[in-house]
Amino acid sequence: MTFNVRLLTRHFYDAEGVLLPQEIIVYTDYVCPFCLLAEEAIVQATDDLDVEIRWRPFELRPDPVPTLKVEDPYLPLVWRDSVYPMAEKLGVPITLPNISPQPRTDKAFEVFAMAEEQGVGHPYSMAALKAFFQQERDIGDPEVLADIGESVGLERQAVLDALAEGRYREQHQAAQRHAVDEARIQSVPTLVIDGEVIQGVPDPAALKRFLIERG
């Protein structure tokens, strides 16, 4: 599939003029199936490239916006026409979770902030996406989030305590404000590569060419 690119800036160098490794910033929401598919596209595109992947939160439906319901016509239609065909093409196992209404993701992103602090933001994001779309687990449930956190090396009780105390709430809210007000994110997945914005799930081969041309 094609993807849209919005040019902002070009490469970044360190103080000595050395070109830094390319960085892919991925704005995501853990209840967006295309975000899981985008991750696989990125993996395929960057298999032999020097690229660093950084995840950033963007809640598609922050409180009080209602979340989606499985019984509404919209979700089954989108999955039938877009999600499942793309997942098959990329080789990603995925299922429409039978959880209705879909969970909010603010708590999941609070745990992401904790995971980032401990250097496991990337594996946590992948585990959260897979928990929802491959295991049909409710990622709005603190106990489920504690399980996910523990699976990537966080202390389970520390996750529960942090959620109960709202320890990372403001940090997540600040990240959400940044995504909306400064980065001007409107949809996910959105990739930012060396300052260039790519919206949607990229074709792995096209993304690889895009990275090599700017490498």
What kind of region is each of these model predictions?
Residues 1-19:
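N-terminal amphipathic/basic-hydrophobic helices that include classical n-h-c signal peptides
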Residues 16-19, 25, 34-51, 74, ...:
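C-terminal cap of thioredoxin/glutaredoxin-like
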Residues 25-27, 56:
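Solvent-exposed beta-strand sheet faces enriched in polar/charged residues
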Residues 30:
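Cys/His-enriched microdomains
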Residues 36-135:
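Structural alpha/beta surface segment adjacent to cysteine/selenocysteine redox centers
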